[in-house]
């Protein structure tokens, strides 16, 4: 055999070997990927209540140690009521957009939600009778911007360990953010342009740390992201308080990037899911830049537009479903996609 032929054969063997090694590596990656899929034995369909259906969608173990659940709720209605801050006072508040329970008004109470049957704009219908509301958002010319396909998250969050999260108590209500004149920080009220590149450390790419607490100047064709985060540490006693805030607290922060290394303060020792409202708006020639938009609650012209971002929440979940969300998705560290309940079922879709 000539030296040239021998070299060609060696080269061919090396190529084959590299192909085999690449195939094995790819197979290993696939095997590891599939190993992250949660093995589920779904319940019998006859056992499912209305609003809950079987689903063969895969659920994966979260890659960052958090446990997550998400759900969609459509806009329901608009009014100037606020049953938490102005109970039984029709029209006493600034304009709000409501989601979930379709009859939320100044007279809505926890009993109202718990006795409701089929009035909800959320996935699962009557299984999620929670009342969600936020101030209306307007362009510079006064056109209201619709909250399209918003996502409502129930997560362990990055600060607390997933396995210590408790089911929120029935009857719990709370407010995130401030509608008053004092400026707020980005713990609760978060805005950012989707085109921004976060320059600071973060827990993961889904939690950039370049948010601002006011409406930013996003260019045309960009996307404005808005996120309102509720406190997740409960005092363990009171379902409400005089200001709808004092019975709740934000956790003591984890050390970046170590997820779950924070804790609840001693005054508010009970950890519940981190609830957040998540919205996105396209920036167009018609809407103009978000820096020119304003909230219905923006009353102080000395502060940047959007500084009054806040949200209200009243727990109207079916207790069994909320327990499934916490036990199946959050405590386990699973990443349950929109509507998935972590047991081979999901909430009935609305889109």
Language-model features: where?
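Short, aromatic- and cysteine-enriched interfacial helices/patches
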Residues: 1-3, 29-33
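Hydrophobic alpha-helical membrane-insertion segments, chiefly the h-region
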Residues: 18-30
